[in-house]
Swiss-Prot record:
Identification of the protein by name: Aminomethyltransferase
One GO cellular component, as annotated: cytosol
Pfam families: GCV_T, GCV_T_C
Underlying gene: gcvT
GO molecular function annotations of the record: aminomethyltransferase activity; transaminase activity
E.C. designation(s): 2.1.2.10
Positions of disulphide bridges: none
Amino acid sequence: MLKKTVLNAAHRAMNARMVDFGGWDMPVNYGSQIEEHNAVRNNCGMFDVSHMCPVDVVGADCRTFLSRLVANDVAKLKVSGKALYAAMLNEAGGVIDDLIIYFLTDTRFRIVVNAGTAEKDLAWMQAKVAEWKLDVTITQRRDGANNLGIIAVQGPNARAKVWEVLPQTKAATAGLKAFFAAEVDQYFIASTGYTGEDGYEIMMPAGEAEALWNKLNAAGVAPCGLGARDTLRLEAGMNLYGQDMDETVSPLDAGLAWTVSLNTDRDFVGKAALVTNGQQKQFLGLILLDKGVLRGHQKVMTKQGDGEITSGSFSPTLQQSIALARLPLGVQIGDEVEVDIRGKALKAKVTKPVFARNGKAVI
């Protein structure tokens, strides 16, 4: 039996094509994935991300707990509403999950974890609270009486559309810089996203989600499915958990070194392994020079040895096939490499691992 978000009926009313996404009944598109992708790059689109799991972390030892739990340093969170992207690691330095941590007060944080990893993440967090004997209470907000719905509104016109539909939120959100959140009435509005565009991710009581979804649609915001979400995040060079990294992959090998704070005395789970092992691979982009489509798990042949594509697809913005790949150290941006596509060695160019943001190509 597939799990359903609070917006399931709304998707079906809009004739969405539904698919099994990690055990969730989710919309892959509402007609044209390309049109949905372009709507976000050029105007505004909205996504149901209610399958993601908000987790409230409350208690006197919140900071101590989070400083030991993740590789990024929560000491950076000094202003209420500030968010931090972080990786939660196992003892071997592999990525259990990537998540966003919101600082609200010194005794109240909110974490958003991935849909498919929510159960294992919660179990890991609870185990660490017990092991470290900390005054921390962890409450998931996806399933149950106090569950939240989440709608991501993304694109250059996203803010204007949100203010049109929720005018009472404008004063608190107009000045939000990237990776900040504000609470207005029952809405938790964050200037975050997974598309490379401006916009908000809005959490609200689950019972309010369908009304907001329909109001946004009536205001001209295009509903977008998982298909467009994937090509948008790929163009933006954003990792997908389970594809670009997992529990066997170090954040240093997944292009996430910028989220790892090693230069302090702070200890965290997985730190010793990262220090011992260092970086073994590098995370770069590819653009296919021959005809074909780059896909995950295709082998990449370089002068320094073999690598592997972790995510690949056709880019609607570049009109080329692009990929993210884990490649040997020593490979340089601009190098020409070969990709094994159905037994044929096709040429590709190595690029930085970001292709398009803010409505245009950056390659």
